[in-house]
């Protein structure tokens, strides 16, 4: 019996050792699983945080693009309003030659050209429709210069020095362009009631 007791004792010790190894293995597995779960949660949190950042960046990018598109459209509308305003203005002044005040305006425009080219031998460039008014203005002012009927304009004139190095544009179109170039913001304010509409 001692032999059987010895075997039972060995089997019992082996069983205990086996159970202890299994318990230790289970504890290690549980620890590994907890650690893996913690790491998984951390990785998940990192990916979630990155996804949130990416969404915020994309949202901001989309907002920026939308704002740019709105600004572009507003700018196009403003430009169209300005273009329309200048077109209407040009239409209104296209018949200025028949206005009784045109000779006085033409004289003032001529004096400005002459003044801009003071000290130079002057050539006036006029529209053939203004030849009589130009002659009358030159007679009235006593200014002597060459006249070339070589431009087409709704009104006004331009002048050059004889060598062509100096030019003075004083047509109504050139004056409107100068106004357009220097007064766009003011025009927008008048049309829309402020720089931002």
UniProtKB/Swiss-Prot annotation:
It holds the Pfam family vATP-synt_E. This is A-type ATP synthase subunit E 2. Has multiple subunits with at least A(3), B(3), C, D, E, F, H, I and proteolipid K(x). GO terms for biological process: proton motive force-driven plasma membrane ATP synthesis. Belongs to the V-ATPase E subunit family. It is found in: Cell membrane. GO terms for molecular function: ATP binding; proton-transporting ATP synthase activity, rotational mechanism; proton-transporting ATPase activity, rotational mechanism. Its main location: membrane. Gene3D superfamilies: ATP synthase, E subunit, C-terminal (3.30.2320.30), F1F0 ATP synthase subunit B, membrane domain (1.20.5.620). Disulfide bonds: none annotated. HAMAP family: ATP_synth_E_arch. Keywords: ATP synthesis, Cell membrane, Hydrogen ion transport, Ion transport, Membrane, Transport. InterPro entries: ATPase_E_C, ATPase_V1_Esu. Component of the A-type ATP synthase that produces ATP from ADP in the presence of a proton gradient across the membrane. It comes from the Archaea. The keyword Ion transport applies. One of its GO terms (cellular component) is proton-transporting two-sector ATPase complex, catalytic domain. It is a peripheral membrane protein. The keyword Lipoprotein does not apply.
């Amino acid at each position: 019996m001692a032999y059987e007791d010895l075997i039972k004792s060995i089997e019992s010790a082996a069983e205990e050792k086996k159970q202890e190894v299994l318990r230790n293995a289970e504890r290690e597995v549980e620890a590994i699983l907890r650690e893996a779960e913690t790491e998984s949660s951390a990785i998940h949190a990192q990916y979630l945080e990155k996804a949130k950042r990416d969404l915020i960046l994309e949202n901001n990018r989309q907002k920026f693009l939308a704002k740019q598109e709105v600004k572009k459209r507003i700018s196009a509308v403003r430009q169209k309003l300005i273009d329309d305003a200048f077109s209407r203005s040009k239409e209104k002044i296209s018949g200025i030659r028949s206005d009784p005040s045109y000779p006085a305006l033409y004289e003032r425009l001529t004096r400005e050209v002459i003044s801009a080219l003071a000290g130079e031998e002057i050539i006036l460039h006029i529209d053939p429709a203004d030849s009589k008014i130009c002659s009358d203005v030159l007679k009235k002012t006593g200014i002597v210069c060459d006249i070339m009927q070589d431009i087409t304009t709704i009104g006004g004139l331009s002048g050059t020095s004889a060598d062509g190095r100096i030019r003075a544009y004083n047509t109504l179109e050139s004056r409107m362009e100068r106004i357009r170039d220097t007064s766009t913001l003011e025009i927008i304010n008048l049309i829309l009631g402020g720089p931002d509409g």
